[in-house]
């Protein structure tokens, strides 16, 4: 057991954010009859738990360029992909602008005019494209990933095991959607029936449909909508979802990217935030 006096609490909390904790992260506050406050790692009948966010690291970097609404390039040339979100693509030699892509990029450029940003990583720090994965913060503490969602400039895209801030991100999206901000008011991102899915559907999309059966193999479990359309969930992520039978026979909105194999269409779902019961 350890105790921390009241006047040392601020220093303790600062260290909790800046360095790895080498002791328990459940901290309890208690106060005696004379008003003396102590903090302990052991609960008592009179104590209450103090919420501590452990193992959160933020490192200062300098941005050289904004690639698009969810990717920045640091001074050392490394690309950083913002975690937990997706913004529409911007024009390059392979594709045209997606609606809302330029607006997201311009917004991020305006936020990063002084080029200073703090990076906070999660469980997986780099993707298959060798990009760093991070939550971005301004020096004043503004969470840019979250703010993009709040302004309707991005959509939630949570990929396990990077689940940090998932609840806050989902809530921000729900509020922007409710207010029809940004992309939530754009015709290109309104839900369409899965029965109308085609190879013309590119980028992030919203679909509606009712699953009728479940099929499982070694790697994926699939919710089947008809003989040409399914959504698939990696079996290693199933614990994040309610029992998939919960979805059977119920209208769903599905959010994600369509892949095609011959005349069959499939949408890979990583997190239950992409499946919304209607």
Show the residue positions of the predicted features.
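Sequence-pattern detector for short linear motifs
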Residues: 8-9, 32
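Bacterial N-terminal signal peptides
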Residues: 11-20
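Positively charged n-region of N-terminal signal peptides that target proteins for export
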Residues: 1-7
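Small beta-barrel nucleic-acid-binding modules, primarily SNase/OB-fold domains
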Residues: 2, 23-278
């Amino acid at each position: 057991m350890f105790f921390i006096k009241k006047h040392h609490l601020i220093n303790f909390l600062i260290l909790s954010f800046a360095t790895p904790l080498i002791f328990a992260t459940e901290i309890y506050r208690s106060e005696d009859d004379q008003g003396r406050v102590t903090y302990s790692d052991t609960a008592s009948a009179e104590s209450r738990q103090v919420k501590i966010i452990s193992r959160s690291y933020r490192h200062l970097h300098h941005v050289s360029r904004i690639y698009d609404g969810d990717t920045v390039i640091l001074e050392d040339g490394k690309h950083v992909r913002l975690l937990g979100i997706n913004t529409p693509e911007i024009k390059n030699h392979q594709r045209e602008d997606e609606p809302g892509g330029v607006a997201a990029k311009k917004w991020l450029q305006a936020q990063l005019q002084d080029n200073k940003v703090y990076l906070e990583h999660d469980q997986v720090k780099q993707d298959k494209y060798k990009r760093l994965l991070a939550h971005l913060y301004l020096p004043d503490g503004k969470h840019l990933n979250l703010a993009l969602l709040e302004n309707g400039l991005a959509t939630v895209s949570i990929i396990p095991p990077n689940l940090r801030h998932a609840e806050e991100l989902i809530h921000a999206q729900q509020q922007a959607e409710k207010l029809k901000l940004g992309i939530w008011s754009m015709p290109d991102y309104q839900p369409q029936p899965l029965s109308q899915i085609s190879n013309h559907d590119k980028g992030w999309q919203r679909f509606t449909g009712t699953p009728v059966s479940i099929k499982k193999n070694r790697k994926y479990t699939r919710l089947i909508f008809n003989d040409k359309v399914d959504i698939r969930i990696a079996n290693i992520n199933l614990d994040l979802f309610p029992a998939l039978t919960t979805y059977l026979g119920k209208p769903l909105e599905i959010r994600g990217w369509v892949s095609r194999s011959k005349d069959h269409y499939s949408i890979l779902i990583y997190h239950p935030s992409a499946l919304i019961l209607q």
